[in-house]
Amino acid sequence: MAGIQQQQLVNDTLPASLNGSSNRIASVNVEGQPQPWADDLDLQDPNHQKPGWRKFLSYVGPGFLVSLAYLDPGNLETDLQAGANHRYELLWVILIGLIFALIIQSLAANLGVSTGKHLSELCKTEYPKYVKYCLWLLAEISVIAADIPEVIGTAFALNILFHIPVWVGVLCTGCSTLVLLGLQKYGVRKLELLIAVLVFVMAACFFGEMSYVKPSATDVLKGMFIPKLSGQGATGDAIALLGALIMPHNLFLHSALVLSRKMPNSVRGINDACHYFLIESGFALFIAFLINLAVISVSGTVCSAQNLSSENADRCGDLTLNSASFLLQNVLGKSSSKIYAIALLASGQSSTITGTYAGQYIMQGFLELKMRKWIRNLVTRCIAIAPSLVVSIIGGSSGAGRLIIIASMILSFELPFALIPLLKFSSSTTKMGPHKNSIYIIVISWILGLGIIGINIYYLSTGFVGWLIDNNLPKVGNVFIAIIVFPLMAIYILAVIYLTFRKDSVVTFLGPNKNDPQQQANMENGLTKSTEGPEMERVPYRGDLADIPLPE
């Protein structure tokens, strides 16, 4: 009987949301737990009286923190190899990737702002038990895969600065991260500002080098706007670029970070918040695009120069983060390696912060578990150290560099399991009501998303079949490997199809009753109660997420 009454309430409210009026729907706590009310978040909120630029600054933080992940060692490694191997031909991947990143990061922010819940919490509510656990495990794997480049990048930086073996540097990364998390207690904003400054110092060096080597503007523009995948390994490098740019854990992170901001509970207030978060993300990702453009352009120009010395030609043939400092010699001279190493160290540590928070939100959302930051980071880092240590001992610097590319490809293959739920939730009337994505955003995001998924599946299948044909293993070994791998590929494809076509079954949003104008007016103006009818919850201010060290 209760289920019938709830369904009747849904039927009464959802049509009102579709009549074209701007009724802001309220979050329904389907878990049965009371959400905290923020009684000071109404039209009298001081934020509502601020000038536009001051109001915008009060929302700044989440987008820039997320954007640090677009400048991590994984991005630098894939950029360097893309430039060295293909010159400017893969710049279009960077352009499309960051445009798509802006779309989905804004969708993640809007999802959190509109629902009062972040992506992992909504996944827990929507999907069956075993699907939920599989998504949680895949999300944790994405955090670990994203941490591998930070481990190796930090080890490379320590190798350049102190001439210690790479594998020893890998072991040291566990201690360096604990030191970083310990320093947060003494001024995390200052620490993050210092890290950001060092990262942008390295970016400035690449911009300076680009002005020195003067890449062909025509070739750069062709690379940006004419898609091409020619040459050996181009498809793999393109997938690695996408994996380094569009990371699954960033979607969970951004949808949670926005909840640390206080927003007035009105249509105008929440729409303003979505608008400001979009502007912030757009500005941050534009800077990230320019930096990635500079790195690829410098790498492509220097490594294709006709007067390249034999020593540098050998470096370009197997370019890694550990050997890339020579690219900055024209700007920095003999000090290029030291300055580059310090900036590389900062790049690795900045991404450690975002990875720690993303892991916390994923665990809290899916499993309702919380860990102290240092424990959470230590567990993730220890798991990431294991493959990095083995590869660095066996393969040295070049092997560790290839592991970064492999980790980026893993992130690209992991993407559908965070992206598809995000696209479905943000386009769903039962989740977002009238504030779901416009038809244009739905079409564009699904085309780009399915395009990336299709490329991944194509590369996975053709690459594996080609490897089976060309390797020197005995036929029995090939058959045994095929028996294991082909079912896994089929499971991957079926899982993507399941997430894509599964119909959402949980209604998490209800609008004001269409027969109660007072309720509709109250929701429009940010009031919490109507004179008649059921009391409706606000889109909650998440006090449990308000300890994020972001600038006020």
Curated annotation (Swiss-Prot):
Residues 517-531 have a biased composition (Polar residues). The chain crosses the membrane at residues 56-76, 89-109, 130-150, 151-171, 193-213, 239-259, 276-296, 339-359, 378-398, 403-423, 439-459, 479-499. It is a multi-pass membrane protein. InterPro entries: NRAMP_fam. GO terms for molecular function: cadmium ion transmembrane transporter activity; manganese ion transmembrane transporter activity. Residues 535-545 have a biased composition (Basic and acidic residues). One of its GO terms (biological process) is manganese ion transport. NCBIfam families: nramp, Nramp_1, PRK00701.1. This is Metal transporter Nramp7.2.
